[in-house]
Amino acid sequence: MNMCGNIKNIYYFCTLKLSNRNKIMRNIAILGSTGSIGRQTLEVCAEHPDLFSVYAITANRSADLIIEQARQFHPEVVVIADETYYDKVSEALSDLPIKVWTGPESLCQVVTAEPIDMVVTAMVGFAGLRPTVAAIKAQKMLALANKETLVVAGQLIEGLCAEYQVTILPVDSEHSAIFQCLQGESIARGCFPWLANDNANPEKPHYLDNPIDKLIITASGGPFRTFTMEQMRDVTAAQALKHPNWDMGAKITIDSASMMNKGFEVIEARWLFGMNTDQIEVAVHPQSIVHSMVQFSDGAIKAQLGCPDMKVPIAYALSYPDRMPSQINGKLRIEDYAHLTFERPDLERFPNLRLAFDALAAGGDRTCVLNAANEVTNEAFRRGQCKFLQMAEVNEKTVAAMPFVASPSLEDYFEIDAEARIKAREILGL
């Protein structure tokens, strides 16, 4: 079924696709199937083989794991992006009727395959931008876990979603929470124009079209929430990788420790939900039970609560607009939580969050530059090449050193990203 047509038809498409379960199975392509989100997405698919067929899986260079996944799920296509590993994967799967692709264009090629209904962008970092754009232009539904796509090029992606009438479903727990809080509200903003009430009265006051006062994105605070600046000076990557609540990949776990991940989620929320920067707040919530909140113009607040298990937002995105039973590690018992606490983030101890707000407010290419610098400093910290607090210092210096580009094109973003990485490495002395 083609998603062409007016915007109102997109909601109908989503509803039809999952309500008629006895007749229609959703074909899924998972970009980054060997990462944390990719593996958990496959687990959700395995729990519901009557609803989801894994059509394609991709990895950069994790050859052994993608071979194992291919033998379990029997996809039509396997992509190993790094050509160095093509022979190994191809030979290992030669006894199965599976196409094995490789090379820099293979990701963009696979997302355009006609049988694919939904693309799950589970890969990490800037590398997710080009295949995400290709999937949008192919009018595929997107389950977006690659937040860097919107961090780098949110305005571009928002415009493409409107042009190609494509549905983006957030996989991040915080944005999934906000998305769930908006169900039933008359709102048509950001990447969700189809949330509007089709029967809305065109004569009603304009303010009723924007009932949102602000979004409140929660943050655990990470492993160093209570550390002083002095204590954080010498923390190690091993310490930073011990997140108190969530099981995530290495890059995002370090970003969570520095609160850059929360900064990126602020930027992502701005584009997903069409908010102004001053309509987005961050609240540190150490228990990670309230995943995010929406405050409306009448003062009411909606919140989505649940155990910190990424399979819940993954399953919600895959099955939207329905909900599926999920084999999560225990459902929330609210009586077990006598106290849920919230506090303001400390921008002096966690300057990366401030940098994200500043870059978003500045506009243009600033968020792209910040993301590029952060990918360099994050990796350098994991390799022991820079200190924990040095990451934010280098990120800020890189943004300040790069010339401002007000309206980047898609190709501009790739040039800006490359130049910002060079500058960040230069500042680090690498």
Residue locations for each model-derived region?
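Short, positively charged and aromatic/hydrophobic N-terminal segments
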Residues: G5-N6, Y11-T15, S19-R21
